[in-house]
Amino acid sequence: VYKRQGTYGRIMHVTGCYHYRGAALLAAKAAVYAGSGLVTVWSNEKVIDSLSLFCPEATSCQRHYFDEHLLQGKEAILIGSGLGLNEDSERFVCELLSHTQVPVVFDGDDLTILAKHPELLENHHSSWILTPHHGEFKRFVDFKQTSEMVDQANAFAKKYHVTLDLKGPHTLISDGNETY
């Protein structure tokens, strides 16, 4: 059966750290292989050069500055997976999140950026999925023992209207109402 490339969704993956380009490449390939119709990787030149060899099915765009037009037609955004922590990434993520209305998945360095800008959590207008490990989650809430983590995760997800996928030996997923 033949279908147009965009029939099964249009994903924007925001990344850009040369040192963690493997994370960007694996995430792009996973999105393509999971059935996303069009995967666009918004990154730096070195990541994009590697992408053309590792995952030629994905499209790409160089990330010099935020351009709202690049979000047109996108149905979901993945931020992280090789983003890198620097002033440009922080400015870029804040600008992007203030303009998007589509679901966003957060993984990696962007969680650190999000923890520094709680106002973004309080004012989002779409479905957000945060995927921190225990150390990243501690940047948002303070818990002393693992037993406190379940209650903290539920309260956090409910307060900010997000789905939390707390990764670890015993992964916890909560939307604030139900926990798995």
Predicted segments with their positions:
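Small-residue (G/A/S/T)-rich helix-start motifs and N-terminal tracts that mark the onset
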Residues: 3-103, 112-129, 134, 138-180
